[in-house]
């Protein structure tokens, strides 16, 4: 069943966390209250509970994804895609969950998603560019206050960590078209970084395309996915209104180059609710958020982690 939690924001409005109850357990409890644990998941998670073998013909990947959603009874999604996508003559879901199927298609095409939460539903937003994201009301700029300054009434960050990791600087793909055996299909995409060891190349075959322009897009998607891992900033604080998919600008940090606009690609929250039983002790209500961010100017793409299904031998149509 659906369930939502609400959190009061500084403005007096409320932020909602909505999901499907995927698991519920009851413990022994303490005092006069029972103990329950509830796991909420987005409706997309239910696609991990169904599998199929299907063929889609003459459709673009966004249309295939939306058809899979609708066929399973889901309509709470939004198309915020801005790029053009090729038409697939033939696309097969083969002995895999519907979640794995749509995930690997999105990974190949450079599509990702995030969720917008409302009181009675959550909406999956298909995205592929900066224009799909907004700053939530009242959070266009969020200040950094050092922990030594003590408690601040305004939502703020109090901890900052930045990590950079060397990544491959270029990717070359190649493939073969049996209908055009002489066609040159090798493509290359690169993103230069101003540091040592930034130009190591990757090569992969087959690239899963028969037109070089499609290969160029796939190579770009993959190198952007890799380079999105190059620099990550983790910000911890009391910031109640920001979540994955949101934009904000950091202000007040001692390193001025870090006072820039970020895209949130992951969020964790810790909420402690005050206890209702007299004499039970414990702290009052507390909230802490930890946001995983990238520079808003860096394109975000999903890493290709979903395995391709394997067809073992020829398949008869009889």
Language model region names:
Residues 1-318:
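Amphipathic alpha-helical and helix-coil boundary elements used as assembly
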């Amino acid at each position: 069943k659906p369930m939502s939690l609400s959190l009061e924001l500084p403005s007096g409005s409320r932020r909602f966390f909505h999901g499907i109850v995927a698991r519920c357990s009851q413990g022994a409890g303490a005092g006069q209250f029972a103990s329950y644990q509830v796991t909420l998941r987005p409706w997309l998670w239910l696609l991990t509970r169904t599998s199929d073998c299907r063929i889609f013909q003459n459709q673009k990947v966004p249309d295939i994804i939306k058809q899979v959603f609708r066929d399973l009874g889901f309509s709470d999604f939004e198309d915020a895609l801005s790029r053009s996508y090729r038409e697939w003559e033939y696309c097969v879901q083969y002995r895999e969950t519907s979640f794995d199927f749509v995930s690997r298609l999105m990974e190949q095409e450079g599509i990702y998603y995030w969720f917008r939460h409302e009181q009675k539903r959550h909406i999956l937003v298909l995205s592929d560019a900066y224009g799909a994201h907004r700053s939530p009301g009242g959070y266009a700029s969020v200040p950094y206050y050092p922990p030594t300054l003590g408690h601040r009434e305004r939502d703020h960050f109090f901890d900052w960590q930045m990590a950079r990791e060397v990544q491959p600087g270029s990717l070359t793909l190649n493939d073969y078209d049996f209908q055009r055996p002489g066609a040159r299909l090798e493509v290359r995409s690169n993103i230069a970084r101003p540091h040592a060891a930034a130009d190591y190349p990757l090569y992969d075959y087959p690239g899963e395309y028969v037109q070089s322009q499609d290969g160029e897009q796939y190579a770009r998607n993959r190198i952007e996915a890799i380079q999105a891992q190059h620099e990550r900033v983790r910000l911890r604080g009391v910031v109640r209104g920001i979540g994955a998919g949101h934009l904000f600008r950091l202000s007040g940090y001692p390193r001025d180059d870090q006072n820039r606009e970020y895209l949130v690609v992951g969020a964790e929250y810790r909420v402690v609710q005050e206890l209702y039983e007299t004499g039970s002790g414990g702290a009052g209500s507390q909230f802490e958020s930890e946001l995983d961010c990238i520079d808003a100017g860096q394109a975000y793409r999903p890493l290709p982690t979903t395995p391709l299904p394997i067809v073992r031998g020829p398949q008869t149509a009889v």
